[in-house]
Amino acid sequence: MYLIENLPPELWASAVPGVPRRTVRMIAAHIHNARCMWIKMMGATHGVAVLKTVDPRRVRAPELLRALSRSSDGIIKLLQIGIAQGGVVPRAAWQNFPNDVVHFLNYFVAHEAHHRGQLCMVARQLGQRLPGPVAAGLWQWSKRARE
């Protein structure tokens, strides 16, 4: 994940302003751990491998990057299952949105964009604003897709 790769390393253990019990590391780990939860609830019965979550208090950026790659593959498999089932993803026990592929994908886009925005804002609040090319690179979707 481009943003995680480009966060200043000194931010990793920094507390979130106004939420001192939460760190940059914890926000980043939450993205992977949330994916794992959905994969477990929706994909396990369809043969999608249930992944290990990461420790939000101890995970290092390289470990998280590897985990995010695996959980990305799991979410893609859930989308493929939904497409193969006529546009309907498997239902989760406490799902808070309709179980069509469009809503499922939009949920993940919104959830992950929210947390990426948090990471960018926290970096700025802590005086470690992302360099212009890095911030602009967040919007280079075609380039990111090729990476």
Can you annotate each of these PLM segments?
Residues 6, 30-33, 70, 81:
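Residues within well-ordered alpha-helical secondary structure of globular protein domains
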Residues 1-4, 11-54, 92-147:
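Short, contiguous alpha-helical
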Residues 40-82:
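Helix-adjacent hinge/juxtasegments
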Residues 10, 79-95:
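Acidic catalytic patch
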